[in-house]
Amino acid sequence: MQTEKNEHKSNRFTRTFFEQDLILSHRIAQQLHKRFYDRIDHSFFVSMKVLRRQHRDTEAQQIETAVQGLCDKMECDLTQASERIVATFAKAQMPSPCGHSDITASYKAEYSTGYSFRLLDLFSRFDRLLMQIEALELHNLGTADECTSLIRFWHGEFHRFLNALTAVRSRPDPHSSSSKETPHDKA
């Protein structure tokens, strides 16, 4: 049973969302998901859906274009890296293994925009890439130092990607009372 306060809060800010199962095996993917995903999903909702409700379509379109570009680039980079690893296994006449971990975690991730759904897919691809890199070392196709270096590189790349998504935000509504300039601001 909801209290009156919670009912008021839920009526003031409602959003439609869906749930997606997300399984991450690598601890780095899990850490980044926990740290960034909910915040970025909320930011996408506010920056796209809420802006459109406020008839700020041009601004929403600019944000969508920026997010689309970032996601396209990361998807391309992850795909190319994964293909190189698969080619390394093929060259060694080995099938590319599907890795598992003793710390595999399953999440019920909520998404409220198509870009959030796409971000969940990118998290899954990132996790798969990290597991493929781990498999290189386990199958003696790369040294421990090489694989550790690759994992650090991709950790940094994906972290920068998530920071870039976080930075793509809407500006306050210029017509709202909270964003009006005060005489003190002009000084």
Task: Specify the residue positions occupied by each region the protein language model found.
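Polar/charged low-complexity regulatory segments
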Residues: 1-131, 135-137, 148, 152-187
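Conserved hydrophobic residue
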Residues: 141-142
